[in-house]
Amino acid sequence: MSKEKFERTKPHVNVGTIGHVDHGKTTLTAAITKIMSEARGGEFKDYADIDNAPEERERGITISTAHVEYESEARHYAHVDCPGHADYIKNMITGAAQMDGAIIVIAATDGPMAQTREHILLSKQVGVPYIVVYMNKADMVDDEELVELVELEIRELLDEYDFPGDDTPIIFGSALKALEGDMSDIGMSSIIKLVKALDTYIPTPKRDTDKSFLMPIEDVFSISGRGTVVTGRIEAGIVYVGDELEIVGIKDTQTTTCTGVEMFRKLLDSGEAGDNVGVLLRGTKREEVERGQVLAKPGSIKPHSKFEAEVYILSKDEGGRHTPFFNNYRPQFYFRTTDVTGACQLPDGVEMVMPGDNVKMQVELLSPIAMEDGLRFAIREGGRTVGAGVVSKVTD
């Protein structure tokens, strides 16, 4: 059988497994790839391949993550699984694997545990929009009432963190049985049901080109006789020659017009998400624009300096700080293309933050940055990364 060409016709969705240690995340990931590859072609990854996940670096932090892919009738899925609990936290905070939805794996034998709770809270904080539940190890429970209790507990826990507990699909099965080829309800068919739940419950994400135009400014030049050119990689949306744009962040917001788009020394009518371009601006002086600002569709993004964040602080072994920090710690916050100094307020009852900890904090920047909930940043001291974070809520 010849290999099928990877088709771009199906919408692409990013998912991942989360949940307490030893509840079966990696076994489930292996089972999905096995059953979907048998049904639709694709590559089966066994448990060992996934568990020996390669280390990656994201914003200066080393994270072990396994990436697998599979297809359903309707979609192409990219799925991440992390071997260690710390890897999950780093992964979710750095956005190394941005998820359109998460599969939370909960052992029916234990019910929700400490890390289950922590992962649901983090999903909320970092903006994972949808959760589907796989209640695993069904072959080890024969008490129907116990299963109902666990299900109730899961729905209440989801409600507690503002996920719709009553509407969340909960699939009951055994990832191990499915992997072994068991044909019963809790075996292979539970995996088919799970993938169907992903197809129907997680909406197709908006493509980057459908979002409002946004380009972080990396560099500014002036070209005599033509005006000012700003360069950068377009993060979202499309810009057309003739568009009115805003320059947002650091200083007061200014309005300008795009009079040209250039890529690889060629003039274009437009630039879109993913392109590295130079944008020629009319009526904007070279000294009015700087790296760290963004070029955006008017009204689509505002500058802010106060926010609540979920942060991971690197351990000493990861090249982070060797000592804890205290309230009013003032590092640099690196947003998109630039560093801005900010002051940190720790939560009540938290005296200090140790290297290797994750913490929720309030931050006030010295100058405003174009920002919205979900924006990622690095925390740096003198150019060295000491932490990573995500804006969970803009507060000004």
Swiss-Prot record:
G2 as annotated region, ranges: 60-64
Domain tr-type G intervals: 10-206
Region (G4): 136-139
Region (G3): 81-84
Entry annotated with the keyword Electron transport: no
This protein's GO CC annotations: cytoplasm
Known function: GTP hydrolase that promotes the GTP-dependent binding of aminoacyl-tRNA to the A-site of ribosomes during protein biosynthesis.
Subunit and interaction comment: Monomer.
Identification of the protein by name: Elongation factor Tu 1
Organism: Ruthia magnifica subsp. Calyptogena magnifica
